[in-house]
């Protein structure tokens, strides 16, 4: 069984920067968001579940999901958010478990980028968990800029996940992304070489 490292963070904290860098270094890195996108394509397991629940109005003329509408339906209603988390969580976990088993056969070390790693209790899948951390104000600002959201909309999306401060206490390693990209990737280099960012383990 290969060594599996989980990568997590929050919306707009810089997870994908780390995941892309790891791929450039030759590592396999499963991106849970990309898996979700595949499952949400027409005919995918999540697509079918979402259309059955919300109805045809969430399908665009080209047959794809209307993601902005879907996000607003889910994020504006706590009940819908709860349903979405549960059903999507179950289907996604099954798909990720299959990918994990496949990679464990061939890879000495590989990574899985899972945004809700702690919230949905994936911790015991991993030998280590790396958290990409950024201060709350910077996170809100980056999210507003990236997705063209108002401050209230950005805050509402962040509220759907645990605060990064809470995740910080649970992670094996913390990658600080309050600086620039080079500083972030330098920390990844140190971990890949077996160094330790801190002495908590």
From Swiss-Prot:
NCBIfam families: dephospho-CoA kinase (TIGR00152)
Family (UniProt): Belongs to the CoaE family.
Taxonomic superkingdom: Bacteria
This protein's record includes keyword Hydrolase: no
InterPro entries linked: Depp_CoAkinase, P-loop_NTPase
The name this protein goes by in its record: Dephospho-CoA kinase
Keywords for this protein: ATP-binding, Coenzyme A biosynthesis, Cytoplasm, Kinase, Nucleotide-binding, Transferase
Signal peptide (from-to): none
Classification via Pfam families: CoaE
UniProt xrefs under SUPFAM superfamilies: P-loop containing nucleoside triphosphate hydrolases
Gene: coaE
Residues where ATP binds: 12-17
């Amino acid at each position: 069984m290969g060594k599996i490292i989980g990568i997590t963070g929050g919306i707009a904290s810089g997870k994908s920067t780390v995941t892309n860098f790891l791929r450039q270094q030759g590592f396999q890195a499963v991106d849970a968001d990309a898996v979700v996108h595949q499952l949400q394509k027409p005919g995918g397991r999540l697509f079918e579940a979402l259309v059955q629940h919300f109805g045809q109005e969430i399908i665009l003329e080209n047959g794809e999901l209307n993601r902005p509408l879907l996000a607003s339906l889910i994020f504006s209603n706590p009940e819908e958010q709860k349903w979405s988390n549960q059903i999507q969580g179950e289907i996604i976990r099954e798909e990720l478990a299959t990918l994990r088993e496949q990679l464990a056969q061939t890879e000495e070390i590989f990574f899985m980028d899972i945004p809700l790693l702690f919230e949905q209790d994936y911790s015991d899948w991993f030998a280590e968990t790396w958290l990409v951390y950024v201060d709350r104000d910077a996170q809100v600002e980056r999210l507003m800029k990236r997705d063209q959201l108002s401050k209230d909309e950005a805050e509402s999306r962040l509220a759907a996940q645990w605060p990064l401060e809470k995740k910080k206490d649970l992670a094996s390693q913390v990658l600080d992304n309050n600086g620039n990209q080079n500083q972030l990737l330098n920390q990844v280099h140190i971990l890949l070489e077996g160094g330790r960012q801190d002495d908590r383990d």
